[in-house]
């Protein structure tokens, strides 16, 4: 059986993976290696912490016999391509600074486009204590309308083209009514009415997207305009068609007495006719900040019809902040910031803004702890905040989501009444971030939200829309079943630069999204270049160690690299990724050696050589195969150990050797069981199989290159041991379920068959698999809990590698068809490395 990364390496392109287990705790090291100072000076010109790369590893003289060249070079002029790529990347980063600066500005202080529609309604609010026809309370809004009419006579946001839309028609009509109310801007009114007349057919075209409540608000505003004496530029037939739209909508809503309908009517109250609105009922939805749903338009309409100190105070706060440029929603900082944080993570560039993201999450956590309305009462904000806070180690309880545990709560909200897919998707994603078995609220929330999303996939409401792809992707790939490079590529290729929040009118600027897409595409392209150069380096290493000449082993170098890249994706972690890939390749060689390429005597001979290590010349080579395998192992482990020792400022090579020795001994035990037909107990099986899972030889060495000091007390800590245990257990059990049928045919046992045997055949195979899947889920939650907790001793970047490894294991051991199958996943990983991005602009 293969490790999760071996599963990639095996794939369907080669023979099926054999039984391989996982590792255990590796001890730390002690004294610094003698070559550390020289390497440190070469890379840093002094005594600073070194960045060691494979470019100089050949120079690291370990004091041991030098074996055949490992393909490393000493001078930067002849360094491997991926090291040159790192230097190029440093220059490329200067080009990206403009994008990063603009993204950072929006991240820290979200930009809101002025909303002509909301500005118009705020402009209609009269000065308190005066006759309604005497003076506006917010003259700056009236002035903005006068100064910001487009050349075609319209008002409204239209960043992409000059064509009309229902949103622009609604905004234009609102601005006309505001100017007419204060008897100003006759020329602007004339031009605005001409624009509406020219584009009136759009209003009744049901194929054109409409803002929320358009079929109620636009007809009501047409009636208001006519009552104000405006000569509305439409025929009586056209007016009747508009009113028919309103009547049809009211008929559809007539029998609905739900709280959701009440919330919906309150949300669009500014556009409803007077006879349809009970303002005392509407004001029940007023928030602590005085607003209705954080909507300036709805709040202004309430003030027009019914004076309220808190509502007026809210509008003053909006105008004081934005002047006449009132946005559609305020406040929206937290939602906007969290949305951008989520986007940065999804498209793979969050590491460029880590400190800024932490400040935002710190602020969000404070608001969460205070149960602030801006976070808790807005469903998508609440769900997104919970997910991001929990995944970043903040102590948020699922009990805080009790108000959205039931589907009825969702349906009684504005978002639920509007059947808002984005809000529903956020609730579903939040439900999956479970850290224990006792979180019934998340379980309930995931059940009903998942069912509703599946129903949406079967309907025509969102077919062909970008949100449909998001829903399909989220349902098919939970966050623990995705690989970072694949996830980043999918999100970049499906990025919609025109996307904006589903609200009454357009509000969010697109240029920020364009900057995000540009930076992500540039970052991903550089990753690809780095990956390609790393593969060339690995091919040279394979030839120089003569691994390609071994007849008993399968050719798995590229696949070994793909599995390493799936687990360690950032281009700046080249050394960790290369170390991991080389180690995977060697574990596959050892796997095949013990499985099909050696006798018992050869296996014992190889173990004896590794036990002697530097004194290997005291042991004779039993065969050329033993010699070839040992020399490849000896050369590479020493090389990696020397580099890791330079980075860690102490000798860590011997601990990597010990992990290899543990691995080889467990392979020998497995081989002996096969030869003797021994049936181990479940306890014996798991104890051995978690070592042959190959986590020890492949992961610890990579962890040394993650930019963190892994002192001896860290790698001997119980937390470290538990991370290994949980990851090994998950991977072993996932492997066993996937490989059960094949191993039965080969006469081999694994945890599934042993569980059935232990039950004396009372338990069926399917029941055994179900029980094991429950164990996997439990281990996964516990693993995630350890990874995200902030009070541990293991550095965060190192813990995250365990989580990425779990995701690699989960994906490649999935039994699902299509994209989740190893064959499809291998094709997708190849696409990550070799195929250019297919963005909307391409």
Curated annotation (Swiss-Prot):
<dbReference type="InterPro" id="IPR050148">
    <property type="entry name" value="Terpene_synthase-like"/>
</dbReference>
<dbReference type="GO" id="GO:0006952">
    <property type="term" value="P:defense response"/>
</dbReference>
<protein>
    <recommendedName>
        <fullName>9-beta-pimara-7,15-diene synthase, chloroplastic</fullName>
        <ecNumber>4.2.3.35</ecNumber>
    </recommendedName>
</protein>
<dbReference type="GO" id="GO:0016102">
    <property type="term" value="P:diterpenoid biosynthetic process"/>
</dbReference>
<keyword id="KW-0611">Plant defense</keyword>
<keyword id="KW-0479">Metal-binding</keyword>
<feature type="binding site">
    <location>
        <position position="591"/>
    </location>
    <ligand>
        <name>Mg(2+) 1</name>
    </ligand>
</feature>
<feature type="binding site">
    <location>
        <position position="595"/>
    </location>
    <ligand>
        <name>Mg(2+) 1</name>
    </ligand>
</feature>
<dbReference type="Pfam" id="PF03936">
    <property type="entry name" value="Terpene_synth_C"/>
</dbReference>
<dbReference type="GO" id="GO:0009507">
    <property type="term" value="C:chloroplast"/>
</dbReference>
<keyword id="KW-0456">Lyase</keyword>
<dbReference type="Pfam" id="PF01397">
    <property type="entry name" value="Terpene_synth"/>
</dbReference>
<dbReference type="GO" id="GO:0000287">
    <property type="term" value="F:magnesium ion binding"/>
</dbReference>
<dbReference type="InterPro" id="IPR044814">
    <property type="entry name" value="Terpene_cyclase_plant_C1"/>
</dbReference>
<keyword id="KW-0150">Chloroplast</keyword>
<dbReference type="InterPro" id="IPR036965">
    <property type="entry name" value="Terpene_synth_N_sf"/>
</dbReference>
<feature type="binding site">
    <location>
        <position position="591"/>
    </location>
    <ligand>
        <name>Mg(2+) 2</name>
    </ligand>
</feature>
<dbReference type="InterPro" id="IPR008949">
    <property type="entry name" value="Isoprenoid_synthase_dom_sf"/>
</dbReference>
<feature type="transit peptide" description="Chloroplast">
    <location>
        <begin position="1"/>
        <end position="56"/>
    </location>
</feature>
<dbReference type="GO" id="GO:0010333">
    <property type="term" value="F:terpene synthase activity"/>
</dbReference>
<keyword id="KW-0934">Plastid</keyword>
<feature type="binding site">
    <location>
        <position position="595"/>
    </location>
    <ligand>
        <name>Mg(2+) 2</name>
    </ligand>
</feature>
<feature type="binding site">
    <location>
        <position position="743"/>
    </location>
    <ligand>
        <name>Mg(2+) 3</name>
    </ligand>
</feature>
<feature type="short sequence motif" description="DDXXD motif">
    <location>
        <begin position="591"/>
        <end position="595"/>
    </location>
</feature>
<comment type="similarity">
    <text>Belongs to the terpene synthase family.</text>
</comment>
<feature type="binding site">
    <location>
        <position position="735"/>
    </location>
    <ligand>
        <name>Mg(2+) 3</name>
    </ligand>
</feature>
<dbReference type="InterPro" id="IPR008930">
    <property type="entry name" value="Terpenoid_cyclase/PrenylTrfase"/>
</dbReference>
<comment type="function">
    <text>Involved in the biosynthesis of momilactone A and B phytoalexins. Catalyzes the conversion of syn-copalyl diphosphate to the phytoalexin precursor syn-pimara-7,15-diene.</text>
</comment>
<dbReference type="InterPro" id="IPR005630">
    <property type="entry name" value="Terpene_synthase_metal-bd"/>
</dbReference>
<dbReference type="GO" id="GO:0034279">
    <property type="term" value="F:syn-pimara-7,15-diene synthase activity"/>
</dbReference>
<keyword id="KW-0460">Magnesium</keyword>
<keyword id="KW-0809">Transit peptide</keyword>
<dbReference type="InterPro" id="IPR001906">
    <property type="entry name" value="Terpene_synth_N"/>
</dbReference>
<feature type="binding site">
    <location>
        <position position="739"/>
    </location>
    <ligand>
        <name>Mg(2+) 3</name>
    </ligand>
</feature>
């Amino acid at each position: 059986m293969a490790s999760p990364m071996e599963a990639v390496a095996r794939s369907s392109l080669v023979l099926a993976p054999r039984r391989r287990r996982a590792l255990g705790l590796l001890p730390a090291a002690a004294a610094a290696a003698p070559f550390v100072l020289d390497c440190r000076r070469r890379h840093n010109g002094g005594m600073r912490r070194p960045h060691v790369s494979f470019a100089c590893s050949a120079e690291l003289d370990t004091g041991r016999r030098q074996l055949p060249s490992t393909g490393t070079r000493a001078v930067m002029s002849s360094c491997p391509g991926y090291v040159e790529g790192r230097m190029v990347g440093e220059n490329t980063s200067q080009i990206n600074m403009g994008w990063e600066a603009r993204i950072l500005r929006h991240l820290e202080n979200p930009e809101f486009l002025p909303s002509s529609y909301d500005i118009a309604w705020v402009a209609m609010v009269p000065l308190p204590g005066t006759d309604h026809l005497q003076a506006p309370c917010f003259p700056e809004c009236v002035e903005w309308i006068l100064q910001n009419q487009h050349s075609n006579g319209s008002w409204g946001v239209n960043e992409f083209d000059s064509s009309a839309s229902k949103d622009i028609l609604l905004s234009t009509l609102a601005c006309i009514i505001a100017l007419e109310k204060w008897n100003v801007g006759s020329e602007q009114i004339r031009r605005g009415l001409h624009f509406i007349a020219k584009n009136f057919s759009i209003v009744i075209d049901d194929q054109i997207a409409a803002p929320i409540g358009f079929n109620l608000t636009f007809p009501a505003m047409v009636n208001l305009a006519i009552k104000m004496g405006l000569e509305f530029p439409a025929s009586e037939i056209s007016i009747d068609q508009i009113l028919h739209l309103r009547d049809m909508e009211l008929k559809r809503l007539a029998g609905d007495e739900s709280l959701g309908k009440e919330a919906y009517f309150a949300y669009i109250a500014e556009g409803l006719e007077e006879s349809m609105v009970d303002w005392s009922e509407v004001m029940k939805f007023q928030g602590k900040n005085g607003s209705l749903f954080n909507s300036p338009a709805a709040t202004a309409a309430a003030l027009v019809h019914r004076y309220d100190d808190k509502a007026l105070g809210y509008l003053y706060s909006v105008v004081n902040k934005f002047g006449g440029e009132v946005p559609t929603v305020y406040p929206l900082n937290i939602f906007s910031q969290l949305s951008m944080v989520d986007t940065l993570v999804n498209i793979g560039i969050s590491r460029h803004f880590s400190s800024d993201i932490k400040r935002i999450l710190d602020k969000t956590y404070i608001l969460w702890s205070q149960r602030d309305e801006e976070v808790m009462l807005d469903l998508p904000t609440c769900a997104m905040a919970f997910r991001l806070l929990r995944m970043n180690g903040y102590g948020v309880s699922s009990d805080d989501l009790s108000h959205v545990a039931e589907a009825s709560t969702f349906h009684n909200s504005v978002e639920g009444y509007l059947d808002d897919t984005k809000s529903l998707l956020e609730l579903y994603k939040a439900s999956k971030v479970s850290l224990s078995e006792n979180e019934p609220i998340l379980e309930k929330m995931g059940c009903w939200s998942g069912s509703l999303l599946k129903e949406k996939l079967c309907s025509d409401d969102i077919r062909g829309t970008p949100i449909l792809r998001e829903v399909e992707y989220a349902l098919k790939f939970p966050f623990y079943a995705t690989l970072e490079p694949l996830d980043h590529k999918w999100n970049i290729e499906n990025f919609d630069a025109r996307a904006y929040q589903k609200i009454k009118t357009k509000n969010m600027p697109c240029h920020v999204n364009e900057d995000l897409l540009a930076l992500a595409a540039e970052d991903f392209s550089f990753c690809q270049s780095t990956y390609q150069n790393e593969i060339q380096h690995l091919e040279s290493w394979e030839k120089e160690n003569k691994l390609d000449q071994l007849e008993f082993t399968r050719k798995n170098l590229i696949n070994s690299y793909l599995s390493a890249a799936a687990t360690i994706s950032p281009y700046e972690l080249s050394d960790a990724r290369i170390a991991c890939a080389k180690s995977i390749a060697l574990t596959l060689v050892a796997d095949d050696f013990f499985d099909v390429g050696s006798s018992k005597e050869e296996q014992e001979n190889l173990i004896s050589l590794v036990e002697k290590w530097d004194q290997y010349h005291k042991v004779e080579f039993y065969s050329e195969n033993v010699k070839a395998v040992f020399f490849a192992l000896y050369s590479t482990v020493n090389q990696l150990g020397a580099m890791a020792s330079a980075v860690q400022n102490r000798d860590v090579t011997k601990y990597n050797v010990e992990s290899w020795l543990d691995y080889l001994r467990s392979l020998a035990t497995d081989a002996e069981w096969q030869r003797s037909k021994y049936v181990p107990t479940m306890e014996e099986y798991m104890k051995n199989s978690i070592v042959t899972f190959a986590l020890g030889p492949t992961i610890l060495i990579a962890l040394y290159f993650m930019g963190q000091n892994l002192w001896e007390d860290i790698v001997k800590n119980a937390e470290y041991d538990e991370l290994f245990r949980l990851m090994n257990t998950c991977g072993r059990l996932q492997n066993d379920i996937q490989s059960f049928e094949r191993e039965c045919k080969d006469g081999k046992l694994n945890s599934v068959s042993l569980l059935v045997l232990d039950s004396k055949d009372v338990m069926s195979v399917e029941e055994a698999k179900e029980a094991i899947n429950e164990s996997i889920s439990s281990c996964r939650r516990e693993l995630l809990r350890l990874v995200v907790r902030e009070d541990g001793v293991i550095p965060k970047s190192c813990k995250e590698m365990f989580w990425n490894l779990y995701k690699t294991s989960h994906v490649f051991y999935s039994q699902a068809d299509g994209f989740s199958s190893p064959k499809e996943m291998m094709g997708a990983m190849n696409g990550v490395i070799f195929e250019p991005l297919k963005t909307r602009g391409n």
